[in-house]
C-alpha cells in the first residue's frame, strides 16, 4: 500500500483505538461467504488473514487485503485445531495468490459463537502469531456480528471499530473465484461486481 491511505473508506464502530484496522471489501465479502456457509452447515469456518502493518506519525495501521480459507477447521473442547499441515497449506496458498503477502492473523466464524477467544485460543494465537498487532476476527454466523482483537500487551485486546475500504484487488478476486469452485462457497456470478455493489450500497446508507 506504500503508505497511502485508502480513498474509498467506510467507518464501522468506534475507531479511536490503536492500531487502526482497514479491511478491503473483497475480504469482507469473503468473510460473509464463509459465515453463511458455516451457518448453513453448522460447522466452524475460518481463514488466514493476509496483509501488512505500517507506522506513520506515531500511529499504527493494519491493512488486511487478503484471506485464505483454513482447510477443514475443527474445534475441540473450545479450542480451534490448526496443525502444521493446515498451517503449511495456508502458507502455500498465500504464496500462490499473494506473492508478497504476509499472514498477519486469522478469522473464525460459527453458529452462536461467543465473541471472546478464551484463554485456550489466546494461547493458540500467540503460538501461531507471536508478532505484535496480529489480528483475530470472530464472527457469529447466526446474527453476523463480528469483533476484532489485536495481539498487544501480552493478550488479545478487543478493538472497538475498524474501516472497510474498496479498491481494485485482483489477487483476492482471483482467490475468491478459485475458492468458490473448490470449496462450494456461496455462488456469485461476478465477484468483482458483487463486492463493488456491496460497498457502494453500504457507503450510501
Identify what each model region corresponds to.
Residues 1-105, 111-195, 205:
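N-terminal beta-strand/alpha-helix entry module and adjacent surface
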Amino acid at each position: 500500500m506504500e503508505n497511502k491511505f485508502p480513498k474509498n473508506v467506510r467507518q464501522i464502530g468506534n475507531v479511536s483505538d490503536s492500531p487502526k484496522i482497514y479491511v478491503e471489501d473483497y475480504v469482507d465479502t469473503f468473510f460473509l461467504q464463509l459465515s453463511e456457509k458455516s451457518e448453513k452447515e453448522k460447522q466452524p469456518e475460518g481463514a488466514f488473514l493476509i496483509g501488512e502493518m505500517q507506522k506513520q506519525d506515531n500511529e499504527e495501521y493494519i491493512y488486511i487485503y487478503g484471506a485464505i480459507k483454513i482447510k477443514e477447521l475443527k474445534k475441540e473442547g473450545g479450542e480451534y485445531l490448526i496443525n502444521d499441515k493446515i498451517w503449511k497449506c495456508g502458507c502455500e496458498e498465500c504464496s500462490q495468490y499473494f506473492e508478497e503477502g504476509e499472514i498477519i492473523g486469522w478469522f473464525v466464524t460459527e453458529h452462536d459463537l461467543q465473541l471472546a477467544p478464551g484463554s485456550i485460543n489466546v494461547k493458540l494465537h500467540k503460538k501461531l502469531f507471536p508478532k505484535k498487532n496480529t489480528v483475530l476476527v470472530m464472527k457469529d454466523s447466526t446474527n453476523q456480528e463480528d469483533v476484532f482483537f489485536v495481539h498487544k500487551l501480552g493478550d488479545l485486546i478487543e478493538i472497538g471499530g475498524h474501516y472497510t475500504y474498496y479498491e481494485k484487488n485482483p489477487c483476492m478476486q482471483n482467490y475468491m473465484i478459485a475458492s468458490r469452485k473448490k470449496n462450494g462457497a456461496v455462488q456469485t456470478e461476478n465477484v468483482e461486481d458483487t463486492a463493488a455493489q456491496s460497498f457502494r450500497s453500504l457507503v450510501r446508507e
